[in-house]
Swiss-Prot record:
Name recorded for this polypeptide: Ribonuclease PH
Subunit structure: Homohexameric ring arranged as a trimer of dimers.
Catalytic EC class: transferase
Residues that, per the record, bind phosphate: R87, G125, T126, R127
Source organism of the structure: Synechococcus elongatus (strain ATCC 33912 / PCC 7942 / FACHB-805) (Anacystis nidulans R2)
Leader sequence segment: none
């Protein structure tokens, strides 16, 4: 039986997207990113200096932290204190890698950009929403450095965006929500630049393997969705 999307979307249709800039007062960049019912607060803090292993090399650094608030899901999640779960570590590394691909660290100078992605409400796609919102917040943080005379030009060299694609019953669905995510035979997360460059592909078969032809279709669908997300990012920055 063919899968019918619970919210009535077409297979190639994204959820409703919103980027609310300057959501909080103090970070250099602060964006509430929303994809459907998923909400992630993405902030960027600027710190002088770099990790010890980069000191004296004349370049900056960007790193990310990711957490889910206890009330982000129907059942309360315990806060992660001393030990992070493998999932949390994987996601925050993905966010950091993705955002570093967007920026020329040599043009940043010896300063560190700290990305914090806090999930307020989770309905699948939290890691991709975090990447998308963090890129918008990063733009605001860099604009602040330029306005303060700390930088003369932006080190951001490309826009980046991310989206998930699920295979359910052999058919690909763009930007799945939670009911679709739990039904997926294959779950893929794709991060791309604004010229179609691939930054990261995460693809996992939950039960049966998937074919190269299906992977190509997944990437085509992801590229289509990412182009729309990047347009929404740029619109939010106007």
């Amino acid at each position: 039986m063919a899968w019918i999307r619970p919210d009535g979307r077409r297979p190639d249709q994204l959820r409703a997207i919103a980027f609310q800039r300057r959501f909080t007062q103090f970070p250099a960049g602060s964006v509430l990113a929303q994809f459907g019912q998923t909400q992630v607060l993405c902030t960027v803090t600027i710190q002088a200096g770099v990790p010890r292993w980069l000191t004296g090399q004349g370049q900056g650094w960007l790193t990310a932290e990711y957490r889910m608030l206890p009330g982000a899901t129907p059942d309360r999640q315990s806060r992660e204190w001393l030990k992070l779960s493998g999932r949390t570590q994987e996601i925050q590394r993905l966010i950091g890698r993705s955002l570093r691909a967007a920026i020329d660290l040599k043009k940043l100078g010896e300063r560190t950009l700290l990305i914090d992605a806090d999930v307020l409400q989770a309905d699948a796609g939290t890691r991709t929403t975090a990447i998308n919102g963090s890129w918008v917040a990063l733009q605001d943080a860099i604009a602040q450095l330029i306005a303060q005379g700390e930088l003369t030009e932006s080190p951001i060299q490309r826009s980046i965006a991310a989206v998930s694609v699920a295979l359910i019953g052999g058919e690909a669905f763009l930007d799945p929500d939670y009911p679709e995510d739990v039904q997926a035979d294959v779950d893929c997360n794709v991060v791309m630049g604004d010229r179609g460059e691939l930054i990261e592909i995460q693809g996992t078969a939950e039960a049966n393997p998937f074919s190269r032809t299906q992977l190509n279709h997944i990437l085509d669908l992801a590229e289509q969705g990412i182009a729309q997300i990047q347009a929404a990012q740029l619109e939010a920055l106007r």
